[in-house]
């Protein structure tokens, strides 16, 4: 990571935060216009963002639960008819505990939390976890967000699952997969995330562990035309325009 990422700031008011993070992550603190690194973590007046450098670099990446695409999805995303809401089984279990093994930018977890789910997000990549935590902390400024049950832990999902003692009603996973034809926004995010994080090559191992740890079901988000993950066949599949949700139903313990 030291060869690809550096820390910077766009306002002197956030210099001390940038210096602190650079020390914590053992990364260089550079000028805002530096092009010596593939990515810059930038402290702006509004938020923490990830920028790609270069002449054809996509726009910055940051987490905002209060406005933009994420907030729009909360208000106009289709309510309980959304595939992800149906896939996690809210009809039969209205307020489930959900373990999201691949939190990413937190969008799916945010949707589920808005429907009364108690969601624990797991993110293994420290940079993505920083962006997500920054978005969570800024959203605490509004009362309705404070009431959501949404928590983040930065840890490798395999390590967390292998030592997990409690049972979650649902374990959810959206592993990184090859870029397909999507909207400009998703293309930008996928390009940045894939360069930074890479593919989730351990998705089959995570599925095998999740099937042993979940109480009611395991839900895997997949590209519409892709094969299911290696292992047992899903019991139910919810198909959308470009993606689908493979659902593995678990029998109650005797």
Curated annotation (Swiss-Prot):
UniProt cross-references to SUPFAM superfamilies, sorted A to Z: S-adenosyl-L-methionine-dependent methyltransferases
Catalytic activity: guanosine(1516) in 16S rRNA + S-adenosyl-L-methionine = N(2)-methylguanosine(1516) in 16S rRNA + S-adenosyl-L-homocysteine + H(+)
Keyword RNA-binding attached: no
Domain of life: Bacteria
GO cellular component, one term: cytoplasm
Record's subcellular location: Cytoplasm
Key words, A-Z: Cytoplasm, Methyltransferase, rRNA processing, S-adenosyl-L-methionine, Transferase
Binding site for S-adenosyl-L-methionine: 107-108, 123-124, 174
A Pfam entry, by short name: SAM_MT
GO molecular function: rRNA (guanine-N2-)-methyltransferase activity
Principal subcellular localisation of the protein: cytoplasm
Enzyme Commission number(s) of this protein: 2.1.1.242
Keyword set includes Cytoplasm: yes
Function, as annotated: Specifically methylates the guanosine in position 1516 of 16S rRNA.
Family indicated by similarity: Belongs to the methyltransferase superfamily. RsmJ family.
Protein name per Swiss-Prot or TrEMBL: Ribosomal RNA small subunit methyltransferase J
Species the sequence originates in: Coxiella burnetii (strain Dugway 5J108-111)
């Amino acid at each position: 990571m030291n060869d690809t990422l550096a820390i910077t700031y766009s306002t002197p008011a956030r210099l001390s935060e940038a210096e602190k993070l650079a020390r914590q992550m053992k990364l260089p603190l550079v000028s805002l216009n530096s092009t010596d690194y593939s990515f810059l973590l930038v402290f702006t007046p509004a938020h923490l963002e990830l920028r790609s450098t270069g002449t054809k670099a996509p726009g910055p990446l940051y987490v905002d639960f209060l406005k933009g695409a994420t907030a729009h999805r909360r208000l106009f995303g289709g309510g309980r008819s959304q595939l992800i809401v149906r896939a996690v089984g809210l009809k039969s279990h209205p307020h489930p505990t959900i373990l999201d093994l691949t939190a990413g930018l937190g969008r799916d977890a945010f949707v589920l939390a808005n429907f009364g789910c108690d969601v624990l997000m797991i993110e293994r990549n420290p940079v993505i976890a920083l962006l997500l935590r920054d978005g969570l902390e800024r959203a605490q400024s509004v009362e309705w967000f404070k009431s959501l049950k949404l928590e983040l832990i930065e840890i490798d999902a395999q390590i967390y699952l292998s030592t997990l003692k409690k049972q979650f009603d649902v374990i959810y996973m959206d592993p990184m997969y090859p870029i397909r034809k999507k909207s400009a926004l998703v293309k930008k995010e996928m390009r940045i995330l894939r360069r930074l994080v890479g593919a989730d090559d351990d998705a089959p191992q995570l599925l095998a562990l999740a099937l042993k740890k979940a109480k009611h079901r395991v839900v895997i988000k997949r590209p519409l035309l892709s094969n299911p993950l290696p292992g047992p066949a899903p019991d139910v599949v919810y198909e959308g325009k470009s993606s689908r949700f493979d659902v593995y139903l678990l029998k109650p313990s005797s």
